[in-house]
Swiss-Prot record:
Spans through the membrane: none
Gene Ontology MF: a single term: structural constituent of ribosome
GO (cellular component) term, any one: cytosolic small ribosomal subunit
Gene Ontology biological process terms from the UniProt entry: translation
Residues that bear N-acetylalanine: 2
Species classification: Eukaryota, Fungi, Dikarya, Ascomycota, Pezizomycotina
Biased composition (Basic residues): 1-18
Subcellular location: Cytoplasm
Similarity comment: Belongs to the eukaryotic ribosomal protein eS1 family.
Full protein name: Small ribosomal subunit protein eS1
Region (Disordered): 1-20
Chief subcellular location: cytoplasm
Keywords: Acetylation, Cytoplasm, Ribonucleoprotein, Ribosomal protein
Amino acid sequence: MAVGKNKRLSKGKKGIKKRTVDPFSRKDEYSVKAPSTFQIRDVGKTLVNRTSGLKNANDSLKGRIFEVSLADLQNDEDHAFRKVKLRVDEIQGKNCLTNFHGLDFTTDKLRSLVRKWQSLIEANVTVKTTDDYLLRLFAIAFTKRRPNQIKKTTYARSSQIRAIRKKMTEIMQREAASCSLAQLTTKLIPEVIGREIEKATQGIYPLQNVHIRKVKLLKSPKFDLGALLNLHGESTTDDKGHKVEREFKEQVLESV
């Protein structure tokens, strides 16, 4: 007989069931707040395990990234094809204060833009904002028919594509390097850069559907709580200090 564990002895009683614990009873709910650059500040709720022992709930929340439709943040269905990434940087009570972490297009929108009989032009540029955020911007554009054009196709020549791509990189570099991350976000929402590119390249070849299709955050500067609170409109710092009244003054004895 082989020496080993006796399975019959180790078995428990058949009628006893294990006590099930609801995992949500150990979790807390936190509100996710978007920066003040967006119209709708309340993004939603997120769950996290309660602070117990050395495990802190705040540490688990910091660094979380949420992907939200820009249509929900701006309360406008015209922005439904764009997704914004928000990263949790600070916890204030039961609120998670987020910052802009990136932007992207939905796959179905990108697929719908690509059509026959036109040239697709793409460009990307790596740029640093005035508040030291390193970003990579990706632009996309398509050629369109000139006024009174009879020919079906609108293919641009290689020299024209190179000239358009150069203009695209120059405009993206100029617009992003001259402002902070919050100011760049306000430019990205109404697609100011896309319209600027369309206007600048009119003399080379007419373009349509010019978009900044993606913004990728490569590197962030050292975390600044004051800047984040200003971004959320919750800064309480004043230029002047408040006078402190002394209620009790200690008497100094001349001789002991």
